[in-house]
From Swiss-Prot:
Species this protein is from: Escherichia coli O139:H28 (strain E24377A / ETEC)
Record-linked HAMAP family: UPF0181 (MF_00507)
Full protein name: UPF0181 protein YoaH
Family listed: Belongs to the UPF0181 family.
InterPro entries assigned to the protein according to its UniProt record, in alphabetical order: UPF0181 (IPR005371)
Amino acid sequence: MFAGLPSLTHEQQQKAVERIQELMAQGMSSGQAIALVAEELRANHSGERIVARFEDEDE
């Protein structure tokens, strides 16, 4: 479970995707780009936060 994840609007999500794609076009790996954008979102987000739980369905 992850606490304190930013709750993003569709527009904010779209901008994050575009930023990730931009970083990848500049040669960054997808994992690095996602991590960087996630860090930026956490640092700059001032809205609501959600609690998310991710489970592996293979178990």
